[in-house]
A protein has these predicted regions:
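Alpha-helical transition-metal enzyme core signature, strongest for iron centers
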Residues: 37, 87-90, 101, 137-144, ...
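Glycine-rich cofactor-pocket loops
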Residues: 149-171, 280-297, 330-337, 362-382
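A short, charged helix-loop
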Residues: 226-243
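Long, amphipathic alpha-helical stalk/connector segments used for oligomerization, subunit docking
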Residues: 312-398, 404
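A helix-coil-helix interface module used to build multimeric assemblies
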Residues: 2-208, 216-229, 290-291, 301-305, ...
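Short beta-alpha connecting loops at secondary-structure transitions
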Residues: 21-25, 78-79, 288-308, 330-345, ...
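A conserved active-site cap/scaffold subdomain adjacent to cofactor or substrate pockets
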Residues: 244-279, 288-349
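Active/binding-pocket-proximal capping segment
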Residues: 281, 404-411
Length: 484
């Protein structure tokens, strides 16, 4: 730590991965500004922008070459000096660029407004950030699918209201988590595919400045918009904007990221509950400490952390929506400070959550003996309806048998609540005259109560996960080492 006094953002210093951290860093942001200024100047030159005489090219190749030579050598200290004086970040960087590229000073930002660089840069960074999220999502889906395949046949106790319900399998439960993330992947892919460039729209979105530069040539202004977009890697531009692109786009993207964190929180919470039941544990390092006081503790701290980070991201769509709602007329500056916080942190937080998921799901420890014990405590109750039908088939009285089962069930439950280690309902029914000749043991085979759970896992993997794996084969078998 070089300076322990200033606050640092834990998303950057502890949780998010380096690619996402660098994506939202100052170098990438302002280098993209310079690339946007170059793209605009190139497009204006290619479309024949002329000087006041209507003949001489307004932009020459030497100026463009100079801009290309200074895309990344940004003097941030000098830019900070300019901003303290000008109170305007875009103008500060225009002056900073002009000092190292004096030939090009007069053509930088020609016809543009600040949102030409700020908004278009945000769109570029968000699209790349969505790609990073997509890639990690594929890794999570792949890892959970492998876990579901491995444990698809292991019976476990299902819960509704966190009370014992019917049986499912460990793999089927993982398939539920996996499918949620597949839905998130589709939403992220949709957002990437629908993201448009703001383009060159001018101060209020009318393109008046560019129409003036091109002497009233509407077609050239339209081509300028499209050409700049293509140079920056976009196929489509927003058809209309105010000074900014619609902030609903931000809300849609942040909501998609929150959707990923929503699924992660569900998965993480389930893992924490299962850790309490001692059925599944997250990875635990050889020298990891669970508590400074209680040396025996083994807490699901990674799942807890991912839930904590997920909740943070889940709160951000409301801020994005409020920003979109308060964009007065063509634009206010209400959005600026909030977006500087919300957009990077939504991506950093989501990246951190997915890193944790990759790490946790790659090392889950399943405890079949504990799971079987829990199944054994409840399975006798589940078997009672089958036993009742079997006894009736042998000539028993349905109502009388029902009363026998009720009486023995409550007695066995009372014993468990008083400290008994095993459910005695099976033994009670086996020795009751009312169930003579009924094969009680056969009724206690867990496989009889799984329904189609193993088959459902196979179908999910072959019909839903397999296409994802095929499309993103280069992203399979991911892992991630956490800093803390």
């Amino acid at each position: 730590m070089t300076d322990p006094l200033p606050y640092d953002n834990p998303l950057v210093t502890r949780y998010a991965g380096r690619p996402m951290v660098e994506l939202w860093g100052p170098q990438r942001k302002h280098a993209t500004w310079r690339r946007l200024w170059l793209a605009l100047a190139e497009a204006e030159h290619e479309l024949g922008l002329t000087a006041d005489d209507g003949i001489t090219p307004r932009i020459n190749p030497e100026q463009l070459a100079e801009l290309r030579a200074h895309l990344d050598d940004i003097d941030f200290d000098r830019a900070a000096e300019h901003e303290r004086r000008l109170r305007h970040d875009v103008m500060a960087h225009i002056h900073t660029l002009g000092e190292v590229a004096p030939l090009s000073r007069s053509i930088v930002h020609l016809g543009a407004t600040s949102c030409y660089v700020t908004d278009n840069t945000d769109l570029i960074l968000m699209r790349e950030g969505l790609g990073l999220v997509r890639d990690r999502l594929v890794g999570v889906i792949d890892g959970l699918a492998r876990f579901a395949e491995q444990w698809k046949d292991l019976p476990c106790l299902g819960y509704t209201h966190f009370q014992p319900a019917q049986l499912t399998t460990v793999g089927k439960r993982a398939a539920l988590w996996c499918y949620d993330f597949v839905l998130d992947l589709h939403e992220i892919e949709h957002r990437i595919g629908r993201l448009r460039f703001r383009g060159a729209k001018g101060t209020t979105g009318t393109q008046a400045s560019f129409l003036s530069l091109f002497r009233g040539d509407h077609e050239k202004v339209r081509k300028l918009d499209q050409l700049v977009a293509r140079k920056m890697g976009f196929d489509e531009v927003e058809p209309v904007t105010g000074q900014t692109y619609s902030r609903k786009v931000d809300t849609q993207i942040v909501t998609a990221l929150a959707g990923v964190c929503e699924s992660a929180h569900k998965c993480g919470t389930d893992l924490r509950l299962l850790a309490h039941e001692q059925e599944i544990d997250e990875p635990f390092e050889a020298e990891q400490v669970g508590s400074s006081a209680m040396a025996y503790k083994r807490n699901p701290m990674r799942a807890e952390r991912l839930c904590s980070l997920a909740r943070f991201v889940l709160g951000l769509p409301a801020v994005a929506a409020q920003t979109a709602a308060t964009q007065w007329l063509e634009r206010t500056l209400d959005d600026s400070a909030a977006r500087r916080l919300v957009l990077p942190q939504a991506f950093l937080g989501t990246d951190a959550v997915l890193r944790l998921l990759l790490n946790v799901t790659a090392g889950l420890e399943v405890h079949p003996a504990v799971i079987a014990r829990h199944v054994g405590q409840v399975l006798p109750y589940m078997a009672t309806e089958n036993l009742l039908m079997a006894a009736v088939a042998k000539g028993g009285d349905r109502q009388a048998l029902h009363e026998v089962i009720r009486r023995h069930s409550h007695a066995a439950t009372a014993e468990l609540k008083e400290g008994a280690s095993e459910n005695t309902l099976t033994q009670r029914l086996q020795t009751d005259p009312a169930f003579v000749g009924v094969d009680v043991t056969a009724a206690l085979d867990p496989a009889r109560y799984l329904g189609r759970a193993p088959q459902q896992v196979k179908e999910l993997l072959s019909e839903v996960v397999a296409p994802v794996r095929s499309q993103y084969a280069h992203l399979l078998n991911q892992s991630d080492e956490l800093a803390v």
